[in-house]
C-alpha cells in the first residue's frame, strides 16, 4: 500500500487596495499573477506560475473574480508569490507592463487565517 501525502484542492480569491496609479489619463488596469516555489528533482527550486487573474480595468482597488486553483499539501511549506502589474497593451509578456508590486507568503498562512492581508513590496 502506497502512502499518500494529505492534499486539498483550494481556490485563491485575490483583491488589492490602494494600488499605485501608473497611468496618466486613467487609473491603472491591474492583473495579478500567482506562482509557487517548486522543488526540482535536482534539489534546486524555481517559481512556477499557477495562474493569473483577469484584468480589472481602471481600478486602484481591484477585486478579482477569477479564482486561482492550487493544491495545498499539508506537510509541505509551499511558498507563494503574488505579483501585480498595470496592463498597458495587449501583450502577454509581463515585462511590457508596469510592475506595481509583489507579496510573498506561505500557503499555510492563507489557509490558517482564511483572509491574509499583506503590503506589496518592490513598488517602483
Descriptions of predicted regions:
Residues 1-4:
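Intrinsically disordered, low-complexity PEST-like regions enriched in Ser/Thr and acidic residues
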Residues 23, 70-74:
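Short, flexible loop/turn segments at beta-strand junctions in immunoglobulin-like
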Residues 75-79:
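Extracellular Ig-like/FN3 beta-sandwich strand-entry sites
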Residues 6-59, 88:
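Calcium-regulated, polybasic anionic-phospholipid
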Residues 31, 48-70, 81-124:
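C2 and C2-like phospholipid-binding beta-sandwich domains
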